[in-house]
Every structure is written in structure tokens, then in C-alpha cells.
Amino acid sequence: MICDKCQKQATYSRKYSGETLCSECFSNSILHKVAKTISKYKMIKNNELVCVAVSGGKDSLVLLDILNKMSKTHNFRLLVVTIDEGIPGYRDEALKIVESFCMQLKIQHKIFSYKKLFDLTLEESLELRKDQKLSSCSICGTFRRRALDHAAKSINANVIATGHNLDDVLQTFLINTLSGDTAKIGWMDPDTSSNKLRKIKPLSEIYESEIVFYAFTNNLPFQTEPCPHMDEGIRTELREFLNSLESNHSGIKNNMYSSILKISQIVKKANHKEKLNCSVCGNECTGDVCSVCKMITRLTNE
């Protein structure tokens, strides 16, 4: 195979576009696509501090690598944050990888833990739960979002950047749809430019398979061991389902993403709610009690 861009030996075949690319042109195409996504949705503005959420997995480290390269030619700053859920053995390895990579890039790195923020690790939370329908992903996701908010505010960041890729977005849409939680579909609109603390997903238009290839092509270190609790949710089944569809119908993930953008904008307008303050902790929420306080009560009082 010959690269369509530079005529060198190709290493990647992009089925949904029909392109064949060498490693360098492939990496440049990913950088260009991410930059276009950031520009299109006004994700980062001049002189802003971006709180980059880096777990140690492939997605977040690819995100950090790309944002670091972009920061050399654009006017924004980076600070890396890692959330320690308290999963023995698993998180320890990831923290070492992130710390080492941040030292290499000369970017400041801070760690925030569930234990300090909520007085519960994820493992302790799982031991407390009595309702097995309450998945580890539900507990972890609720705590993680609050932990990232806290981290970003504590460092005076303007933006929180996470490594969610195209596949993650599609899976989340299906999870919200299948669970009947349609309000959350409105949260999926990538245009968050009006929010005080913006949460952005610069990799939201990049296939997971291409993130893997980018990581290997650029020799990025990342944790390969999956979360020990990942099989509790439906996400793995949905990943396999979507990959099967894409295998038989190249580009179907891109088509689905385009539909999700339109649906999320409609739902966002229809479900607009005034922001309130939680009566327990004082954090911003849409009801009387925030999701974190509800979760802690559910775990400790059941």
C-alpha cells in the first residue's frame, strides 16, 4: 500500500474514507481533526487554563499528547489531573505512567482521591451497596464527575478536557436511551461555550481504533489492563455491537454521531432547567439534592 498523501509506504487503511496513510500522515490527520473539533465548538479560548483529566489509559494520554503539541502553537495552558478511585493494584500502575509522562512533557500533575473528597473509595462503596442493580460504573461516574469539577475549580481552570472518543459517545447515547434517561442526551451537545466551567471532549469525533493506532505509532505509554469492574455494565456489549455494525457498514459510526448531535440539541432546549444549589452540600444541581449526595445516602443508609 502507498500513502495517498506523500506516496511513502502506507501503514493504515481508513475504511470509512477509503484513504491509505503512512504513520506520519495518519498522525497529522488525527491532529488536524482534533484541532478542527476544538475550533468548531469553541472548546478552548485564548489564554485559558485547561484541566486535562488523565487516567493513564490510551484515550487520555493521546488527548494529553495532542493538546501538548497544540499548546506550542496556540495560546492556552495545561495542567493534568488524575482521579484516584481507590482500586488497589489497578490505579497504582496508572498513576506511575501519568506521573512519568507529565515529567517528560514538563506539565504539572495533581492527584485527587475519592477517599479525601467523599470519605469513601470505590472499593468501599461497592462493599456498602446492597442493591446489585447499582453498578460500579454508576457509582464511579457520579463521584468522578464531582471530583473533576472540584479539581478544576481548585486550580482555577476554565475548561475540563476528557478523553472520550467517538465510540464512547455512541455507547453513552445508547445507554441513556435504553435506560430511559433522555435528559442526559441533552448533555451530549459538544457546544458548551456558554458554560462557566466548560467540559470538552476533543476526541469525540475520533474512532477508538484510530486512537489505539495513534498511541502505538507515537510510542505513547498507557495502561493496558482494563478496569476490574468494567464488565458490570452494558457498555462492553454495546461496544461489540457497534464494532460489528461498523465492520459490515463502514462509516456508520460517523452517521450515528451526526444524528446524535441533532437529537442532543433538541433535547437540550426541551429540558432546560434552572440551576439550583444542593440543600446538603451546596454544589450546583438541577434538583433539591445533587446526585453525589443522593448516591452517598443510598450507599450508607440502605
Predicted features and spans:
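Flexible helical/loop "lid" subdomain adjacent to adenine-nucleotide binding pockets
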Residues: 31, 39, 49, 167-171, ...
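ATP-dependent adenylation/nucleotidyltransferase module used to activate substrates
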Residues: 2-175, 179-186, 205-218, 290
